[in-house]
Amino acid sequence: MTTPDTPRPPGDHSKGPQTYVCIDYEVDGEPQGRDPQNFVEEILVAGGAAMISHDIPVVASFDDVGAAMEHAIIAQWRTQREINDRDRKLRIGVHLGELDHAIAVMRCANGNQIVFSGTVDSATGGMLDARPMALANIWSDSEPTQLWLSTDSRPDIDGRPLRIP
């Protein structure tokens, strides 16, 4: 279901700033359920995402930050309930800005976590159900960013500390 899309170069906001949703897996043992990649991509595309071919299993671009967060939460929730694989859990990162920054945010997440950056919090007016986790300098070309843990994916949220490099 992945369709090719070329991420804009850093600083190119010709289409306006994009919100990226990046998804990888935390695998502990032998996955028991089906691979959730196509399932997750269908959910994101239904929410208006453009899928981007990448080494990471799922990378999506949204024009609307609210839609990006909503569909990241839906993808997490539905995967937990409909696939229910205790050995393969989604790690989700959401960032409004550059794709490489979104990937860095995702790499801070553990399985069953949706982590988002301060740009997402600002763009949504601080209205998301979340708790602040860390002020981290996860990319070298800017100031530290506040990382937030979405609490909308309860009851299966993972409260472990983030994977800050």
Whereabouts are the PLM-identified features?
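Catalytic beta-strand-to-alpha-helix segment of the class III nucleotidyl cyclase homology domain
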Residues: 60-164
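Intrinsically disordered or compositionally simple regulatory linkers and C-terminal tails
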Residues: 1-17, 150-165
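Catalytic NTP-binding/metal-coordinating core of nucleotidyl cyclase/transferase enzymes
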Residues: 2-70
